[in-house]
Amino acid sequence: MKDDKKKGSKDNGMSIKTCYVIGIQCQLDAKENKKTNTLDISGRRKVDDSLMRQTAEYCREAVRFCTSAILSEWDFLQSVPKKLWRSAVDKLIHTTAGNKARYPEFDKKFKTMPGYTRRMVIADALGMVRSYKENHAKWETLKPAERGAEPTLGIPPRYELTFYDQERRMSRLSKGQIGLKLYDGKKWDWYYFQISASDAAYLARIGKSRKMLSPTVQKIRGRYEVRFCFEERKELVQNDRKLDYKILAVDLGINAAASWCVMTADGTVHAKGVIHLTCEEDRLNRMINRKRQYQQAGKKSSCVYRWVKEANRQLSIATAKALISIASEQKVDCIVFEHLDGKGKIHGGRYRERIHMWRKNDVQARVTDMAHRLGMRISRVCAWGTSKLAFDGSGQVDRHSVYHFEHGKKVYNYSLCRFQNGKIYNCDLSAAQNIGARFFLREYERAGAMGMFPGTPQRTLNTLIMFVKNGLPEKAV
């Protein structure tokens, strides 16, 4: 599942777009019975690969023609409002009773193309040309020594087929039957395909509460799949005063899946804990060890890499679900993460591979999507020093002071650390409390109350103790 969010107006809420990828089981040899509005199925067979390939190549050639026409008429399009670009290009290439096309070759070459497919091709071609023009304009502004290779207009080698409202038949979706209009080399006709009953029931159920958008056909590892897209609108927390929020501060870790704490603006920590997903973590470690065994034996390990990737993905899914479960139980208004860009060289010795596989951005994206559906907001703070500094203000922590011996060697427990005052504490849990403190300190600064606190670099050295010992500033109340 992949989610794409688009912010709307306050009246309409936030638009959340979700994609579900469903595999096609087989192709149906069927004809539509208009009297009973059912399919007369005479047989089942493998998906016709040549049919899909011909349709994709046909549309790809149409995109190539449209991009050439748009490039030639780019100066003309600059005088047209952007909202009318699609209709303007349609008039340039398609002749009607009231319009004579400037490029009649399109109708001759693609005379059987449906109108909705033509509009899809025009939209894709406009996006390609517009991106090329913007990249080329940026390239020209650079100095000759910094330019590099000149941007080119590239047509993708593969074209994903998108089916709009007019050309998809989803009325039989509850029965697991979908209809797609495809090109067989001579004409466009309806072809029907079968998906699993469980997938069909799930899509039919979520389609009652969400708007179905245009599905897309894609081929992954030799199998055809349909990507169904849905849109829904959700109202988020409308309170603009963030000092009234109850937040869930999250520190995503490597030793543990995540550490969290629930906090309010007066510095009170209502709940805290560490998420340990032992089943998923053990599965991932086992797959990593299996991969090493394959590499040491000189065996082909392509399948093992896929196992590791899938185990890692399942770990991120379980982490996101656990965080959302805690947020729902605690009834928080906002979930606060660290801003993790992941740039720079990765250090860490034996943990280097785990850092490479750290799906921090994937977990944050999944939590963001699920939180928005529940009306919660998402915020991020500066990550520097959250784990390095103790939440009680005692200074930097020591992560090499907690260890035990195995086979005569020291084995450090990096989940625990020692504060300067001698206290042994969970390092990630301390970081989670610092993350929550930085969120509220930032809001205090925006409210004009930072004069109540010590003058330290706000984005790097702030810890929980900074505003706990000072109390709730009256200026911010």
Task: Please report, for each region that a protein language model flagged, where it lies by residue.
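Nucleic-acid substrate recognition interfaces
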Residues: 1-477
